Amino acid sequence: MSPTIRHVGFIGLGRMGAAIARNIMKAGFTLTVYNRTTAKMQPLVDAGAAGAASPAEAAAGADVVVTSLMDDQSVLDAVDGGSGVLRELRPGAVHVGTTTISPRCARTLAALHAAHGSEYVAAPVVGRPDVAEAGQLISFVAGEAGAIARCQAVVSAYSRAAIPVGATPAVANSLKLAVNYMLSAVVDLIGQVFAFGEKSGIEPQHLDMVIQTMFNHPGLQEYAARMRERRFDDVGFDLLGGLKDVQLILDASTEACAPLPFASVVRDKALTAVAHGLGAKDVSVVYEMTRMNAGLR
């Protein structure tokens, strides 16, 4: 454990957040947790964490506060709302943001913390909830060097790799959006190949074998298996979250004046799947739209 960091506040206990929080506890840190749905706090409270009634209460006395939330607005509300983190966070404390947010939101958070006298470190994560549970996430970390050093032991508690990407927090979020775009594009392409294979007489297990051999990435292999089996109810990351992420990269690419032509294709297919009532299923359910477009049922 870090010689200076003892107390961690944690806000957001969804599938990812709860897994990250458990690993922080396992690393020996004192943990105070907050979640809007209070029932989600109970398993961690039963395991020894303190429960808080607001983000501000979770931040009170904390050396590091970690947020794992849904989107820009939920993070801004938790940080700067009426009962937000900044109401109680002490000067010099560090806010570690794991949420996939826009670069614009990251710049806003950095400015809010600078005005408050605290530090913001962007540390968005790559990996599904099962990877988070195993403490094997990849974190892209950006912020002031001293702040990164102070929160390093906390980030390491749930990450197999914490990759430093500079002093500007928004850069870490831009990198996360780029990685999400790449993965979502590849997942969609794999789905297209499965649909082509089904109509061309290729056995799904043979295609799956090729994919497992050629793409040595556990996340892509998992998505390929889900599509082959059409297994979308055991949700790791839901389609609504995936739609949010691809919209973020489209917005960021517009701001940067860097066209990403395939991103709009991925977004529209995800949006079509949501319109068909599939938003709460695993993000790989976009494969069902590919099958539909190919005339498969």
Placement of each model-derived feature along the sequence:
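Rossmann-fold NAD(P) dinucleotide-binding segment
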Residues: 55-119
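Rossmann-fold dinucleotide-binding core
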Residues: 100-181
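Hydrophobic residues within alpha-helices
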Residues: 20-24, 40, 109, 154, ...
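Hydrophobic beta-strand scaffold residues
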Residues: 31, 51, 120-121, 162, ...
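Helical "substrate-binding/catalytic lid" subdomain
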Residues: 169-294
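NAD(P)+-binding Rossmann beta1-loop-alpha1 motif at the extreme N-terminus of oxidoreductases
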Residues: 1-68, 93, 98, 129, ...
